Amino acid sequence: MMDVSSMYGNHPHHHHPHANAYDGYSTTTASAANASSYFAPQQHQPHLQLQQQQQHQHLQQPQQHLTYNGYESSSPGNYYPQQQAQLTPPPTSSHQVVQQHQQQQQAQQQQLYPHSHLFSPSAAEYGITTSTTTGNPGTPLHPSSHSPADSYYESDSVHSYYATAAVATVAPPSNSSPITAANASATSNTQQQQQQAAIISSENGMMYTNLDCMYPTAQAQAPVHGYAGQIEEKYAAVLHASYAPGMVLEDQDPMMQQATQSQMWHHQQHLAGSYALDAMDSLGMHAHMHHGLPHGHLGNLANNPHQQQPQVQQQQQQPHQQPQHPQNQSPAAHQQHHQNSVSPNGGMNRQQRGGVISPGSSTSSSTSASNGAHPASTQSKSPNHSSSIPTYKWMQLKRNVPKPQAPSYLPAPKLPASGIASMHDYQMNGQLDMCRGGGGGGSGVGNGPVGVGGNGSPGIGGVLSVQNSLIMANSAAAAGSAHPNGMGVGLGSGSGLSSCSLSSNTNNSGRTNFTNKQLTELEKEFHFNRYLTRARRIEIANTLQLNETQVKIWFQNRRMKQKKRVKEGLIPADILTQHSTSVISEKPPQQQQPQPPELQLKSQGSDLGGNELATGAPSTPTTAMTLTAPTSKQS
């Protein structure tokens, strides 16, 4: 760190980081106590304090992680311009308020000072506790952290790295982050940082490369913890999609550091409600992130680091998060935590601050804006945070649903084109009407999906309906309601048929138009059984995607037609008897064994053949059927 501080010109502060630089930031313990008060002032006096703090942080973060400071410093110049927001976010947890301000100010400062590495602030903001955690919260960390972190961070490549691999870079800062909150865990963090420092120092060049290369790995882990914010900080635009990887990168090497950082971030976040609030204030999103991401993930991150690195304060502050991150306490878990907090330049801060100031290039504005915008973004981007932020997961689900459904829907339009043109036309064009006409339940459900299916454009609502309809269609009882969904979705399976059948079967006039497939199956069944048991009727209705009532009425009409034909002498009377007998005798076996399969396969084959073939087996439920359907249908 000495080198780093001298490198960054912060070494004067760097030497007295505990006492001077970090009142709340400098000494982890003090930072824990002072974090909120210090950060609040920092927030208010961001530039001077941020500069001082950042310098102090740099000084201290030379302790805590000069690595990070170097990192941050390096990255700020390079990275900050690109990822000022990202840099700013790093101080999410304990520095969040202060660091967010610091980072924001750092972003400004770094704007002021191209070489943010000169200020540890970025490092500090990034939770550049790497150094600190590595050594004592004080200077000891600087050297060990400093060498690895220093080299690691000193390199302007770090800038690039941060810009590119800010996440990885952040890892070392993760311990830096603990500067404030992690100083309690500074020793652990320091130790981790020392480990990290060695790793970083050895990987100084590598870190940039490895971390970048490792991003995918980190990404995997990071997403779990919603490190998207971290990486997003760094890779806001670049890694926004692949935020996690950067985190892993950090994690792998600086994973402990990251853990520390997350400790720090979490610690400070949780340490001082004011931090969270301040951070929130500074980053409109901190509270939100803290809420959704930070609490769950930052807390976890911080927690894990806390647990790993005995940060009583952080642990106390983040007890609820500790349970979550004990798993993270393992190196891998730590990595995840690190990913969260450190990911990109303190991705954790990002997340905590802005969730992910992922896009946010400028930490301060991006952090606030990104925090506001990215909390959802981060959470949504990090499905892992979905637990913390149900909205995200659910948002993603929504997004995902349409995509899968969209294919189904798109195929639905194809369905009309397929062999069952009439039915599918109904489905596509008349599905809404059909659905309306179809079952009452089906009509309600069907209308939404049908609209979607009919339009051929999957609406989210339509998609959701479709999914529901798929489920319903799959359910025998839901034949009516399923059909609408099936219609909308154009589910290849019975669902689609049911909706098609319902739609096809139900004209605006109220008359049901049966598809050839449906008629074939009904005739086949009628051939064996003129009278259906209710169970069989339900089975057939489900298979053909019809309502029980439709099947019942069809059989009634068919029997009347048969009787009429016999009466007219068109059909031998014995046929009726044979029919009856055969039906009676065969009814149980065929209904139970051959017919159901046949009906299902054929009916589905027909309907699916029509629907599904048209759909191209887009629907999941129909996939199996689709294979069958194409075979039966096409064959």
UniProtKB/Swiss-Prot annotation:
Biased composition (Polar residues): 341-352, 376-389
Tissues in which the protein is found: During embryogenesis, expressed in mandibular lobe, hypopharyngeal organ, neural and epidermal cells of procephalic lobe, sensory cells of clypeolabrum, posterior midgut, thoracic and abdominal segments.
A molecular function (GO) term: RNA polymerase II cis-regulatory region sequence-specific DNA binding
Family: Belongs to the Antp homeobox family. Labial subfamily.
DNA-binding region per Swiss-Prot/TrEMBL record: 507-566
Location of this chain's protein in the cell: Nucleus
GO biological process per UniProt: brain development; brain segmentation; cell differentiation; cell fate determination; head morphogenesis; midgut development; positive regulation of transcription by RNA polymerase II; regulation of transcription by RNA polymerase II
Keyword Transcription regulation carried by entry: yes
Protein name as it appears in the record: Homeotic protein labial
Keywords, ordered alphabetically: Developmental protein, DNA-binding, Homeobox, Nucleus, Transcription, Transcription regulation
Role according to the record: Sequence-specific transcription factor which is part of a developmental regulatory system that provides cells with specific positional identities on the anterior-posterior axis. Required for proper head development.
Main location: nucleus
InterPro entries documented for this protein: HD (IPR001356), HD_metazoa (IPR020479), Homeobox_CS (IPR017970), Homeodomain-like_sf (IPR009057), HXA1/B1/D1 (IPR046327)
A cellular component annotation (GO) from this entry: nucleus
Positions with biased composition (Low complexity): 39-66, 95-111, 129-139, 295-340, 358-373, 585-604, 617-635
Region (Disordered): 1-25, 39-113, 127-153, 287-389, 584-635
Organism (species): Drosophila melanogaster (Fruit fly)
